């Protein structure tokens, strides 16, 4: 699946009404200065959504999320092997760090430690 976006951005495939849960992740991406685009997805397979989002992203990084789980994927990884997985129970610092790290993957700089 090739990218159909012209603007460089991390693509986020979200199931209905879940982006409000992951605000700290979005803030982490913004802190690193990387744009993102949110698209609704009818599928509930978060890992597959993340991989499809990475395939559509000109930056090769995608996120899939539901209300319970968020996954960061990279286009060059196998579909079943996401880079990061985050559950709703993890704290705000861990959520923000995952957003930072998704953006840092784009930048090619070292990841921040995630403490939950």
From Swiss-Prot:
Broad class of the protein's primary localization: other
InterPro entries: B12-dep_deHydtase_bsu, Dehydtase/Dehydtase_re, Diol/glycerol_deHydtase_re_ssu
Gene Ontology BP terms: propanediol catabolic process
Residues binding Mg(2+), per UniProt: 31
Protein's cellular compartments: Bacterial microcompartment
Alphabetical keyword list: Bacterial microcompartment, Chaperone, Hydrolase, Magnesium, Metal-binding
Catalytic activity: ATP + H2O = ADP + phosphate + H(+)
Molecular-function GO terms, alphabetical: hydrolase activity; metal ion binding
Reported cofactor(s): Mg(2+)
A GO cellular-component term linked to this record: bacterial microcompartment
Coiled coil: none
Pathway: Polyol metabolism; 1,2-propanediol degradation
Gene3D superfamilies cross-referenced by the UniProt entry: B12-dependent dehydatase associated subunit (3.40.50.10150)
Family assignment from sequence similarity: Belongs to the DdrB/PduH family.
Oligomer status and interactors: Forms a heterotetramer PduG(2)/PduH(2).
Function: Small subunit of the propanediol dehydratase-reactivating factor (DDR), which reactivates suicidally inhibited adenosylcobalamin-dependent propanediol dehydratase (diol dehydratase, DDH) found in the bacterial microcompartment (BMC) dedicated to 1,2-propanediol (1,2-PD) degradation. Reactivates inactivated DDH in the presence of ATP, Mg(2+) and free adenosylcobalamin (AdoCbl), by mediating the exchange of the tightly bound damaged cofactor AdoCbl for a free intact one. Expression of a cosmid containing the full 21-gene pdu operon in E.coli allows E.coli to grow on 1,2-propanediol (1,2-PD) with the appearance of bacterial microcompartments (BMC) in its cytoplasm.
Name of the protein: Propanediol dehydratase-reactivating factor small subunit
The species this protein was found in: Citrobacter freundii
């Amino acid at each position: 699946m090739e990218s159909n976006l012209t603007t460089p951005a991390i693509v986020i495939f979200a199931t209905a009404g879940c982006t409000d849960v992951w605000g700290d992740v979005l803030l982490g991406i913004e802190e690193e200065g990387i744009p993102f685009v949110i698209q609704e997805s009818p599928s509930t397979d978060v890992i597959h959504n993340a991989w499809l989002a990475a395939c559509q992203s000109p930056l090769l990084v995608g996120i899939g999320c539901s209300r319970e789980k968020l996954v960061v994927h990279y286009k060059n990884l196998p579909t079943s092997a996401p880079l990061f997985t985050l559950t709703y129970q993890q704290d705000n610092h861990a959520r923000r760090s995952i957003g930072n790290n998704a953006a840092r993957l784009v930048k090619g700089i070292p990841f921040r430690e995630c403490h939950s």
